[in-house]
Regions:
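Short functional hotspots where side chains directly engage DNA or cofactors
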Residues: 159-164, 220, 250, 261, ...
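Conserved tyrosine-mediated DNA breakage-rejoining catalytic core shared by Y-recombinases
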Residues: 150-209
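N-terminal core-binding DNA-recognition domain of tyrosine site-specific recombinases/integrases
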Residues: 3, 15-83, 89, 105, ...
Length: 308
């Protein structure tokens, strides 16, 4: 009779199998969750039951880990257990894990209209390639990895669009218990992230004189063959916000600000979702569509008018 495999042994076999057909960035993210959370809690076991997973979740919450991160960990754990079931190392598992109700609603942080105008005016008046990137993000809602990966060949002045087809990120790699980081240029994670973003008239006006003299293979943020990595660009963005005496919002707030301005301008939700490269429209609705009291009253009034 074959000796039962530990969860650690199953994880190693799963990683070897998974490595062949998922993106390196995804593999790296999975490996980090496994090494930091799954192996320390379950690695020495030969089976996992629901009460153990529920206790794991409650402990992680008590230690300050977000529900989103914990749910990401559970997704990886379930993939590993399905792999074990498929290979007949474990019986099939169906867990019903409970999370406490989140009392506070989390709203995205955005620049006010006045502060957004202040940033856009400044970066136009003080042109640098890094400032150009800030303007592009506020004009098109790009993620930081997408703007860092943007090259001049992606900017199509004739058709007035920016092609989003690459992302730049630094990933953690764990091999034989040795951890290191690596900067990788890759395609975006989902097919929806590969998209075209129309340029505003102001952006075309800014880019048209310089696009034709730029090397198409150079990165926009550096105008060189070597890119700026996201961590470095975040640091620059933070210093720019301090210089302008603006709130200390995360870089991602530029993307949130773009989306919020689109919604405020009555753009239809499906178009906003496509511009942002969201996997589905529900992501856009959950993040950006929060009717205020005045809008709710208007909705009720319109409903009763239709009954008369």
């Amino acid at each position: 009779m074959e000796k039962p495999k530990t969860i650690s042994e199953i994880i190693n076999l799963w990683k070897t199998d998974k490595k062949h057909y998922i993106k390196r960035s995804s593999y790296s993210a999975y490996a980090l969750l496994i090494e930091n959370h799954i192996k320390p809690s379950f690695g020495e076991l030969i089976d996992i039951e629901e009460p153990e997973v529920q206790e794991f979740v409650l402990q992680k919450l008590a230690n300050g880990l977000s529900q989103k991160t914990i749910k990401d960990i559970l997704i990886v754990l379930k993939m590993i257990l399905r792999f074990a079931t498929k290979n007949k190392w474990l019986a099939s598992k169906q867990f019903d894990i409970q999370f406490p109700t989140e009392r506070e609603k989390h709203f995205v942080e955005v620049l006010s209209r006045a502060n957004q105008k202040k940033v856009m005016n400044y970066v136009q008046e003080h042109f640098t390639f890094r400032n150009l990137g800030i303007f592009v993000c506020l004009s098109g809602g790009m993620r930081i990895g997408e703007i860092c990966a943007l090259s001049w060949e992606d900017i199509d002045i004739d058709n007035g669009v920016i092609h989003i087809r690459k992302t730049l990120q630094r990933i953690y790699t764990i091999e034989d218990d040795h951890r290191k980081t690596e900067l990788i240029l890759d395609t975006p994670k989902t097919k929806n992230s590969i998209r075209e973003i129309p340029m505003s008239r102001d952006l075309i006006k800014l880019l048209k004189p310089i696009r034709k003299i730029m090397n198409p293979n150079f990165f926009v943020l550096t105008n060189d063959t070597k890119p700026t990595e996201p961590r470095t660009y975040r640091t620059y963005y933070k210093s720019l916000m301090q210089h302008l005496d603006l709130p200390n919002l995360k870089f991602h707030s530029l993307r949130h600000s773009f989306a919020t301005r689109c919604i405020e301008s009555k753009c239809d939700y499906k178009t906003v979702s496509v511009l942002l490269g969201h996997a589905n429209i529900s992501t856009t609705l959950n993040l950006y569509v929060h009717p205020n009291l005045e809008q709710k009253k208007k909705c009720i009034d319109q409903m009763f008018k239709s009954l008369k």
